[in-house]
Amino acid sequence: GEFTWKLADHPKLPKGKTIAMVVLDGWGEAKPDQYNCIHVAETPTMDSFKKTAPERWRLIKAHGTAVGLPTEDDMGNSEVGHNALGAGRIYAQGAKLVDLALASGKIYEGEGFKYVKECFDKGTLHLIGLLSDGGVHSRLDQLQLLLKGAAEHGAKRIRVHVLTDGRDVIDGTSVGFAETLEKDLENLREKGVDAQVASGGGRMYVTMDRYENDWNVVKRGWDAQVLGEAPYKFKSAVEAIKKLREEPKANDQYLPPFVIVDENGKPVGPIVDGDAVVTINFRADRMVMLAKALEYENFDTFDRVRFPKIHYAGMLQYDGELKLPSHYLVSPPEIERTSGEYLVHNGVHTFACSETVKFGHVTFFWNGNRSGYFNPEMEEYVEIPSDVGITFNVQPKMKAIEIAEKARDAILSGKFQQVRVNIPNGDMVGHTGDVEATVVGCKAADEAVKMIIDAIEQVGGIYVVTADHGNAEDMVKRDKSGKPMADKSGKIQILTSHTLQPVPIAIGGPGLTPGVRFRSDIPTGGLANVAATVMNLHGFEAPSDYEPTLIEAVDN
């Protein structure tokens, strides 16, 4: 029939309840040991959900195919997680989109590739990005395919600017990745393509800063990649990585910037007028700052010295709000008819809040990579400024309590039927690898949840508490059997990345109709099932193409 925004009434659940939708960032479920910061932390609120109402607590999948990523080995992340939570359906995402475009060859027919190809005759193609198979920001096999494809489509001179990982993969693996890359480049040279590594550095020290935390990181990369200037000069990437790990004893994440030079000591690949540049990461957050420096004419955050006239494209578009970069090799998923848009069309007043580092997740990504309000009369979004210029283990409580206070006030105001927040501690503090600080962060997050639940109790509302992916629940690298791994000196290897763990979802509150419980027939439920669940709690049936609801209402 004819499309309509109007949702059918739920046969058993009433409309008009105030619903708190709480997303704990980086909060998975794992076995309770000393590396599970959620277990170690005092988290009485989250514990009570599981203990007191087991029929209203369960685990859902937040990684791999459940969120549109290629395989079950792909960790979830905040962007795809919030897309799934808000959209109610599973869309091919990030790496998967790139895989499909590379496999079909569509990537070479797109506007973005054609744009960079215009420079192949006279200029150099530069590829900049994270060199690892971590699958969080980039994947080595995609770089390998793109190198091969670019050469087949006419690139005559190629320079690769590598960023070493050691954060999403084990420290020290960058040597092997560099060896693989250099072998591929050697094969291209045998085929007559002038291809080599031009520069490099560790991801946390060179280029890959995020949220404008430290522009010096981007400047160090710019100096090496664009200007060909760096404190260290080497003949090859493998030599560079090996030597810098010995002296100044840097780990992969923090390798100082280096350039590759020829026998005369001249850098082999600065970026100059007439060149093409592609940033090969598919994940956006740590490419946005470099993209600004490469694209914005009137950029003044640091002195670029030279602003080369180049054709620049991202692997994907990194910021839909800023339309940045304006050219990209792979188009984003078209996410239409998100739950937020439906609910606003059906009279649900909505409040959303987080601090800067996750504000975009609870708004832009939740709404299907779309900026702004659906209807400003019906919605209010509040951003609390995050602490800047520090790593979050220094302030592990972050703005959890401030976010909860805003949510509480919104709930008690009576103006909103949905109050949606993201509490970032588990993820942002977990990424620092500081176990003690992460424990403090998890406790603060639990206190924030309590404050929101208390407000829901006061207004007779309903709460839904879940997470977007794991992080804080497992802070150690493990071997295949699950045993913690140590480095050569016997020191435990800390895991700073997201995980493959499922995440909890709990529902409750005085407004919840008695007899509502989780269904037993959706064992593989994931984040995308949450949207239909929340629509039901608002008193509506979900659209027929949404992933099925997790709940049922049984007559008592």
Curated annotation (Swiss-Prot):
GO molecular function: manganese ion binding; phosphoglycerate mutase activity
Cofactor note: Binds 2 manganese ions per subunit.
GO annotation, cellular component aspect: cytoplasm
InterPro entries membership: Alkaline_phosphatase_core_sf, BPG-indep_PGM_N, Metalloenzyme, PGAM_B_sf, Pgm_bpd_ind
Binding site residues for Mn(2+) 1: 427, 431, 498
Alphabetical UniProt keywords: Cytoplasm, Glycolysis, Isomerase, Manganese, Metal-binding
Cofactor(s) the protein requires to work: Mn(2+)
Residues that bind substrate: 137, 167-168, 203, 210, 283-286, 358
A Pfam family reported for this protein in Swiss-Prot or TrEMBL: iPGM_N
Residues that bind Mn(2+) 2: 25, 78, 468-469
Domain of life: Eukaryota
Catalytic reaction list: (2R)-2-phosphoglycerate = (2R)-3-phosphoglycerate
Coiled-coil blocks: none
Cytoplasm in keyword set: yes
Function: Catalyzes the interconversion of 2-phosphoglycerate and 3-phosphoglycerate.
Entry protein name: 2,3-bisphosphoglycerate-independent phosphoglycerate mutase
Taxonomic source organism: Ricinus communis (Castor bean)
